[in-house]
Amino acid sequence: MFDESYTIKNFDDVLFKAISDEKRRQEEHIELIASENYVSPRVLEAQGSVLTNKYAEGYPGKRYYGGCEFVDVAEELAISRAKLLFGAHYVNVQPHSGSQANAAVMMALLSPGDTFMGMALPHGGHLTHGSKVNFSGKLYHSVEYGVDSNTGLIDYDALEKLALQHKPKLIIAGFSAYSRILDWARFREIADKVGAYLMADIAHVAGLVAVGLYPSPVPYADVVTTTTHKTLRGPRGGLILCKENEEIEKKLNSSVFPGMQGGPLMHVIAAKAVAFAEALLPEFKTYQQQVLANARTMCSVLQSRGYDIVSGGTDNHLLLVDLINKGITGKEADAALGRANITVNKNSVPNDPRSPFVTSGLRLGTPAATTRGFKEREITLLSNWVADVLDNVHDETNISRVKTQVLLLCREFPVYA
């Protein structure tokens, strides 16, 4: 029997301190990693609930275990809300992550050795889009497309030529570091020319898609995948969507379970249901509008300070800063900003001469800062502080000054009041 007063404190002091330190770090640092966000206390409540105790292999109404009547409610809520959010006919909320969602789609639509196309990682793609160090580049034959070296934009004509040359069975449209709108119709046109499936990975922009601020790929793609965190502001997890296609739906279901996973994480699925309910509220669109406004403001300020932005701007929540003309590496910039309590991630830029462990760029995003309540005023201050640090990454006096300002702003805008 467990007493509900049992807590980590005074039981596991090392872990309790690590959690406490992380909570303080989140409150005292400004988060600019584009893939991170803060979930609501409601999402935390669901994810920390007793649903973590329940095994539920299978799908609602078709489980391999008894006692699933209440977790079925949670999963059905998550499914119905996701369908409403994205206008999808089919939804699978069971993938544990975006990577597993992508893997499940590939398993459903491809055979080992089949050819598929995805965006090159150094050009803004994702590991699961065909990187040779990832399962996607090992189990399948991946052909990478990229961006034009002059514009930083996807070269759709070059993409089409590659598709006609290699005849892929699947084309993945999606990114982890691309700041522009994807032309879903053009991707569909190219896929149709070679008889390929089209998969859209909207992990980064799902929240924007849900409220109509970024074009939806659902009408164009055969399958859509996403994470449930990032701009969607839910728990860390995956999601698969598609328009009506009974054959593909059956393949996807069996690919997720039993193909890729056993029992789903019912506490995470419940947290997804909560996040989807929050995303259906009017204020969620207001939040996403501010995310975009903040990203544009950050882009404008950094450009005015002499920093190059890949593609020349942003249409979404992120921007990729090219530091080559500044003579500093992404690794140096990441570390210096970290000392100022500004959290970012180093990132490769197109045709980067440096390794992925060093890089020549930074990826910045506004979802987490916007969740804190930052608007254009705060983002303008913050963007100038970023530039102040990057102007001289070795000036510790200046970095300390910026850190002091960051701490004051963080106290004004707590994450969890």
Curated annotation (Swiss-Prot):
It is found in: Cytoplasm. Its EC number is 2.1.2.1. Its main location: cytoplasm. Pfam families: SHMT. It catalyses: (6R)-5,10-methylene-5,6,7,8-tetrahydrofolate + glycine + H2O = (6S)-5,6,7,8-tetrahydrofolate + L-serine. (6S)-5,6,7,8-tetrahydrofolate binds at residues 121, 125-127, 355-357. It comes from the Bacteria. Its cofactor is pyridoxal 5'-phosphate. The keyword Nucleotide-binding does not apply. One of its GO terms (cellular component) is cytosol. The keyword Glycosyltransferase does not apply. Belongs to the SHMT family. Catalyzes the reversible interconversion of serine and glycine with tetrahydrofolate (THF) serving as the one-carbon carrier. This reaction serves as the major source of one-carbon groups required for the biosynthesis of purines, thymidylate, methionine, and other important biomolecules. Also exhibits THF-independent aldolase activity toward beta-hydroxyamino acids, producing glycine and aldehydes, via a retro-aldol mechanism. Homodimer. This is Serine hydroxymethyltransferase. The gene is glyA.
